[in-house]
Curated annotation (Swiss-Prot):
The keyword Nucleotide-binding applies. Keywords: ATP-binding, Nucleotide-binding. This is UPF0200 protein VNG_2452C. Gene3D superfamilies: P-loop containing nucleotide triphosphate hydrolases. It comes from Halobacterium salinarum (strain ATCC 700922 / JCM 11081 / NRC-1). It holds the Pfam family AAA_17. The keyword Nucleotide-binding applies. One of its GO terms (molecular function) is ATP binding. Residues 120-144 are annotated as: Disordered.
Amino acid sequence: MRVIGTVGMPGSGKSEAATVAANAGIPVLVMGDVIRQECRDRGLDPAQHHGRIAQALRDEHGPGAIAHQSLPIIEDHLTDATTVLVDGIRSDVEVTTFRDAFGDDFTLVHVSAPRELRKARIEDRDRPGDTDGEPLDAREDRERGFGMDDAIDLADVRIENTDSLDAFHDAVRDLLAADTPHTEVPDNHD
């Protein structure tokens, strides 16, 4: 059993890593989907209210709320798969929740890219909620407020996403194929 979590600032490549995992047949839990579902359950448009509901869940149920809501979904995936990728961890409390649940079978991967590159990617990807709502500065501040920097500091592995998309995909595939969950993956740039 392996549970691989990704952490990184917006536009760093977490979703792209999740796509690589999904293409390899690995189940992916997108933590943002938990929030989007909560928005819909509350009769709200996820594109407009994602950030507010993410904060509300944490205010209502504690800083590990989204991770706790994710655990049964991950455990369900693990009944049929040996590896699950959790996309979009936002805080050290969430890291602790997953480490408590999965022990040494949990690996946290920091997907990293410089801010200007991330900003350009966000502007280019045309994802709902990226450019028509919250500015990047506000989004980064909100995520840092959740404990993103502390979560990043807890990462077991770092993948630098500054080279080509193919190079990044190769680095993610290397991580997914590693014999041990904490195998270091070299940065994918020269």
